[in-house]
Amino acid sequence: MADVAWLKPDHHIVMMGDSDDVDVRDRISVAAYLFLNPVLRFGGFDRLDYESIWDLGMKAGEEYAGMERRKPDFTSLFLEHSGNTYFRSDWSERANFLHLHSGTMGAGHGHSDKLHIDLVVNGEDVLMDGGRYTYVSGSKRFSYKDPSGHNTITVDDLPFTVCKDSWECSKLSQPVKENFRCMELAEFAQAGQLGYMDLPGGVYVNRKVVYIKPDLYVLADEMYTGDRHTYQQYFHFNNHGTVTQNAPGEKKFPCVAYRGKMAEADFYFVSAQVKAELKRGHIARHYNVEEENTVCKVTKPGDGFTSLITVIDAHPGRPLSIEKLPVRSALKQTDYPETMAEALKITTGEKEYVVILCHQEVNSPTDLVEADGCMGYGNVIVFDKAEDVLVGDVLNW
């Protein structure tokens, strides 16, 4: 059933670890037939493929065609044991889909991909894992396995997992699997990793993902440390589309835009002191087949706690505005510093959302957090101002 949960809208799996870009409906179809499972049948082919009929027989093909198909009773899901979260707008082939990985590396075939995300918009890949390309030990193998080859965060341009050869590592990173919550307006997941605790001051890296359904995402990367470091975010784009960067001053925040055949997405880097640059990268959907793609690298220095907030608009044809807001103590009427709490107001046409993100324990039993007239009790809260300015969707306490 996990294969159904992590299917992308195009029926392929994400290229996680040493996986290629593979349609797995043949395996799901066989499982559906063997276990007589209508949900697996939903995730499989309409009719058994040739190889499956060869294995199971002609009668199996006829019986499979007559089986019940049942849509899963979930869209988004957290597979807590493996540490994988899947946000999905619906079960159509034109759905939006985001995957967050925060689990085990998976031995020699695993990559250094803690806190990596994949993003699909309108059924088309936007952010992708680069794949594997080769098993031959060396710089090329490591470039696909290292954190910089994934859509994740690094500290001081150092890897949190260090490859020893094609299969072994001289340093590993412990994942921290945290929580997941689905509500009517928004969904949430967060996870961390301990791969930088050996740096000066130690650095705990935490990634929060807020999904405002159906087409807005907020990434909040939090780095907890007592020292000064430089942080890097990586965004590896599908090479079947074009990636452009806005000119300085053209927009309020640095912005990178992806335009593909079916998908459009804008990435806004809303934290202060960020530098975004586009670079050439590589992607290998299949073994020994390498292509060029575009990578966005975002850099920010920080002394002590540092955050990097990114807003992803998966429907950029509409008007959009983003405003950074202070978070206040509703009782004391004082603003919290950004190292403790931050807020965003995101306006899309007639919709106006307020997102409160608390980085520290600012809540108390006698107080509420407040931003732009919206008040609630929690560490991550989303408000649709037309519906609610008190309580909100509390996604994390």
Task: Give the label of every model feature segment.
Residues 91-94, 104-105, 122-126, 132-134, ...:
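Short, glycine-/Ser/Thr-/acidic-enriched flexible segments
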Residues 74-96, 159-213:
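Extended, loop-rich substrate-binding clefts of extracytoplasmic carbohydrate-active enzymes
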Residues 1-127, 299-307, 322-397:
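Carbohydrate-active enzyme catalytic cores, enriched for enzymes
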Residues 228-283:
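Polysaccharide-binding surfaces and accessory modules of carbohydrate-active proteins
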Residues 87, 123, 153, 221, ...:
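Hydrophobic, well-ordered secondary-structure elements that form the walls
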Residues 10-16, 94-99, 125-129, 155, ...:
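Acidic/polar loop patches that form or flank catalytic/metal-binding clefts of enzymes
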Residues 112-178, 182-184:
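Active-site rim segments in enzyme catalytic domains, especially the processed small/beta chain
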Residues 187, 191-242, 299-301, 308, ...:
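Acidic, contiguous internal or C-terminal segments within carbohydrate-active enzymes
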